[in-house]
UniProtKB/Swiss-Prot annotation:
GO terms for cellular component: lysosome. CDD domains: Glycosylasparaginase. The lineage of its organism: Eukaryota, Metazoa, Ecdysozoa, Arthropoda, Hexapoda. GO terms for molecular function: N4-(beta-N-acetylglucosaminyl)-L-asparaginase activity. This is L-asparaginase-like protein GM15681.
């Protein structure tokens, strides 16, 4: 009986072993793939707790980016303060002569600033445009968002609003401004933004009068030229570990603009846009083209429709090029998980600075995109770590 019992137990164990070994290979492959998928999900950071903080700024000003990044790292819900700090950091020569404000007058020599900030949670937007006499325009834009039911204030009234809140009025024009304007005037007022007027704006300073419509010629000049260090706008995007976005932009306005012109920094969706449910985007380039097409808004909506950040960035730039073949500029797109991409056109190269997004690359690094007039190279990065173009590491103080 004992021998029979032992044999029975051995038979049962043998059957169990055979059953386990006979599991189809497909099932084993399924379990392996499931583990890979779980690992991939973690890598992409789909869970709220797995989103890594990210600070992106256009162009290659690492100092301003680092100042904004340090604010973002200080604690809970600091995206708003971070983008404001980034904009304020560029009110000096380290962010270029035009962004400093004193080298970007209008045709009458006036220096005016514009700025905007957007909350990705509430979708509230605050902006000022054509504001003179107040240096930190981003603070006034933030005040528009916080203390009014409006979205944009302009001109002298924006300055008056700022003064009513205690912001100091400052005379921004100096000798440098006057020299820049004098040199421009002696060069036949070139470049300028007039067209279809008489005398020819390509050769004369005006005053101008309209040409008859049958004499109109389009285009009379190329799009507004943008080069590294010679641009008038800078944008910041901040994403925290909770998936909260803030975006902001500040500009001194296009150099030698017609007085009264409003730029893309003040127009919702042109230079900045964010929605916590989807992601955010910042754009830089020819502001008048950006205002016509709202690329930052389009990029976010493209992601809402299912496009990845790299697809959204490239699609937006291609759309701009279809209507403006000489367009100069770029767009940087970030989804709600912190995956980012950039595309550009009309420049030799577009640079943007990234802090965070990767635990082992948390400090500011400069990403570079080589741009072609018609063909756009896309940089794709973020938590999944794809970088087709790897720049040389830049030393950060």
């Amino acid at each position: 009986m004992l021998a029979q019992s032992c044999c029975l137990r051995l038979l049962i164990l043998l059957l169990l072993f055979t059953s386990i070994c006979s599991v189809p290979k497909k099932s084993l492959k399924y379990f392996r793939n499931r583990k890979l998928r779980e690992r991939r999900i973690k890598l992409f950071g789909t869970k709220k707790t797995e989103i890594q903080s990210l600070l992106i700024s256009t162009w290659n000003y690492t100092d301003a980016n680092l100042q904004a990044w340090s604010v973002l790292q200080q604690g809970h819900r600091r995206t708003r303060q971070a983008v404001i700090q980034g904009c304020m950091a560029c009110q000096n020569q380290r962010c270029g002569l035009l962004l400093a404000g004193r080298s970007s007058p209008d045709t009458e020599g006036a220096l005016t600033l514009e700025a905007a900030i957007m909350d990705g949670e509430s979708l509230e937007y605050g902006a000022v445009a054509g504001m003179d006499g107040v240096r930190n325009a981003i603070l006034v834009a933030d005040a528009v968002l916080k203390y009014t039911k409006h979205s944009v204030l302009v001109g002298k009234s924006a300055t008056k609003f700022a003064r009513s809140l205690g912001y100091k009025e400052e005379y921004l024009t100096d000798a440098r401004t006057k020299n820049v304007l004098k040199k421009w005037s002696s060069n036949g007022c070139q470049p300028n933004f007039w067209r279809d007027v008489h005398p020819s704006p390509a050769e004369n300073c005006g005053p101008y009068s309209p040409l008859p419509e049958h004499l109109h010629q389009h285009p009379m000049h190329q799009e507004y030229a943008i080069t590294q260090g010679q641009h008038d706008q800078l944008a910041f995007l901040a994403l925290d570990a909770e998936g909260k976005f803030h975006v902001a932009s500040q500009s001194s306005g296009a150099q030698f603009r017609i007085p009264g012109r409003v730029g893309d920094s003040a127009v919702p969706g042109a230079g900045i846009y964010a929605d916590n449910e989807v992601g955010g985007a910042v754009a830089s380039g020819d502001g008048d083209v950006l205002m016509r097409h709202l690329p930052a808004f389009l990029a976010v909506e493209a992601m809402r429709a299912g496009k990845d950040p790299d697809q959204a960035a490239e699609w937006v730039v291609q759309r701009l090029l279809r209507h403006n073949t000489e367009f100069n500029g770029a767009v940087v797109v970030v989804n709600r998980r912190g995956i980012y991409a950039a595309a550009c056109a009309g420049l030799d190269e577009f640079n943007f600075v990234v802090s965070g997004g990767k635990e082992y690359l948390s400090m500011a690094r400069v990403e570079r995109v080589k741009c072609l007039e018609r063909e756009n190279e896309v940089i794709d990065g973020g938590p999944k770590g794809l970088f087709p173009t790897i720049p040389e590491k830049q030393e950060v103080p």
